[in-house]
Amino acid sequence: MGYDDTSLANVPPVEDKDLLIPRQKYLLSGVHVGTGIRTKDMEKFIYRVRPDGLCIIDIRKIDERIRTAGKFLARFDPDRVLAVSARIYGFKPVRKFAEYTGAMYITGRILPGTLTNPQAPLHLEPDVVLLSDPRVDRQIHIESVRMGIPVVALVDADNMLENIDLAIPVNNKGRRSLALVYWLLTREVLRNRKVIPPDGDLPEGYEEFATRIMGVR
């Protein structure tokens, strides 16, 4: 049996005017479609569980945490923010976030000692770290905790929240989902820094934040 991920049955009662973007845009990107595994930590973010076992994340909480994260990240000097993705679908979203906000970024394999060893080939000293998935970006997560660096993380239904200072519940594996979340975070950071007006937009849509994979549209 197939499921329509764009159905409004997947969202709690909420008006578009109360969200950063219309509900349908959230649904079309699949930000709300979580994994079939649900940790106890993440139960508070789950709206419902589909008959096939997949968790549907509450878009009100997605929206709320993106707003909160945007305000939080905007407080730091741009070049002291580090965005990370070891997962390929996060490569371009992270790069675009860094391009617009002035943040540092790492994509792909992360070398041990990046945050903890001043003699490492690539040694960085961020004041805050943004992880695309704390499980996949585990090396930076561990080092951030060791160095006392605040951690903001995109977390799916199967993630744990230990040693995460600010969690953004979301599908952190999907190509379009990651593109939309990083696009929104970028916009919120720039709005809070007053780089763009409170209702301002980026010059390109979230689709331009999506990683291009051959044969995938």
From Swiss-Prot:
Pfam families recorded: Ribosomal_S2
A Gene Ontology molecular function term for this protein is:
structural constituent of ribosome
Q: In which domain of life is the source organism classified?
A: Archaea
What UniProt keywords apply to this chain's record, in alphabetical order? Ribonucleoprotein, Ribosomal protein
InterPro entries in the record, alphabetically? Ribosomal_uS2, Ribosomal_uS2_arc, Ribosomal_uS2_euk/arc, Ribosomal_uS2_flav_dom_sf
SUPFAM superfamilies in the cross-refs:
Ribosomal protein S2
A biological-process GO annotation: translation
Leader peptide range in chain numbering: none
The Gene Ontology CC terms held by the record are: cytosolic small ribosomal subunit
The text of the family note is: Belongs to the universal ribosomal protein uS2 family.
NCBIfam families membership: uS2_euk_arch (TIGR01012)
Q: Which HAMAP family match?
A: Ribosomal_uS2_A
What is the designated name of this protein? Small ribosomal subunit protein uS2
The gene from which this protein is expressed is rps2
